[in-house]
């Protein structure tokens, strides 16, 4: 059952960005982002799309979202990422494959979710978010109850949310948070080729699939 708690979902941008580390690698060249503007997502653009929309939060270097966009050209894939090297890599591949069904949100995804006024997403992937393993940094973890509550406002009925991590402690937090928001939470298998994080995972991969049932709201 969807549980709506009285929480203040409108947080300042500076609070959001504490969830992220360094935003660009060394020796990054700005010309790698040429052409990004025409692929940028906005809440107005998403609210006016007629196609099925899939969101990936933190796409890294874009392996997963790229493959999905190639395999499902009738769907629109929105990738949210703050790391500019990853954005540049995905942008390069999108142009190489001449894809027209990829949009990029190059900032904290919560800033986008706050602006959305209607149900837009049919599926959401959150694959290997930064676990911030040190206890004093746990508050920087992006996946928690307030995040799921914020996300749920933009989910279509019966939309699926898939989350994966190889950090056992974070997995427990994700699972308990999901139980407070989603009507259905179950284990799901995450393929090793889902991303470079999955392929390099030395620990067990914990995968969860949540189903949002708007009738329980």
From Swiss-Prot:
Gene3D superfamilies xref list: Vaccinia Virus protein VP39
E.C. numbers: 2.1.1.33
Catalytic function, reaction form: guanosine(46) in tRNA + S-adenosyl-L-methionine = N(7)-methylguanosine(46) in tRNA + S-adenosyl-L-homocysteine
Binding sites annotated in the UniProt record for substrate: 134, 166
Active site per the UniProt annotation: 130
Family annotation (InterPro entries): SAM-dependent_MTases_sf (IPR029063), tRNA_(Gua-N-7)_MeTrfase_Trmb (IPR003358), tRNA_methyltr_TrmB_bact (IPR055361)
Pfam families, sorted: Methyltransf_4 (PF02390)
Keyword annotations from UniProtKB, A to Z: Methyltransferase, S-adenosyl-L-methionine, Transferase, tRNA processing
GO cellular component: tRNA methyltransferase complex
Residues the record lists as binding S-adenosyl-L-methionine: 56, 81, 108, 130
Pathway, per record: tRNA modification; N(7)-methylguanine-tRNA biosynthesis
GO molecular function, one term: tRNA (guanine(46)-N7)-methyltransferase activity
Family: Belongs to the class I-like SAM-binding methyltransferase superfamily. TrmB family.
Function, as annotated: Catalyzes the formation of N(7)-methylguanine at position 46 (m7G46) in tRNA.
Protein name, entry field: tRNA (guanine-N(7)-)-methyltransferase
Lineage: Bacteria, Pseudomonadati, Pseudomonadota, Alphaproteobacteria, Rickettsiales
Gene encoding the protein: trmB
């Amino acid at each position: 059952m969807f549980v709506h708690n009285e929480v203040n979902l409108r947080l300042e941008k500076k609070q959001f960005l504490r969830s992220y580390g360094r935003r660009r690698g060394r020796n990054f060249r700005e010309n790698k982002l040429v052409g990004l503007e025409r692929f940028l997502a906005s809440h107005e653009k998403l609210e006016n799309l007629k196609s099925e929309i899939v969101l990936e939060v933190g796409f890294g270097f874009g392996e997963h979202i790229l493959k999905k966009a190639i395999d499902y050209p009738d769907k629109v894939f929105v990738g949210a990422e703050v790391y500019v090297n990853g954005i540049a890599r995905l942008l390069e591949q999108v142009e190489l494959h001449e894809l027209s069904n990829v949009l990029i949100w190059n900032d904290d995804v919560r800033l986008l979710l706050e602006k959305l006024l209607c149900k837009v997403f049919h599926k959401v992937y959150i694959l290997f978010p930064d676990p911030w393993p040190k206890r004093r940094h746990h508050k920087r973890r992006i996946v928690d109850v307030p995040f799921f509550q914020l996300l749920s406002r933009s989910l279509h009925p019966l939309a699926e949310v898939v989350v994966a991590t190889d950090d056992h402690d974070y997995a427990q937090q994700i699972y308990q948070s999901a139980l407070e928001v989603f009507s259905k939470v179950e284990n799901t298998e995450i393929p090793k080729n889902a991303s470079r994080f999955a392929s390099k995972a030395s620990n067990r991969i914990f995968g969860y699939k949540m189903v949002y049932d708007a009738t329980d709201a």
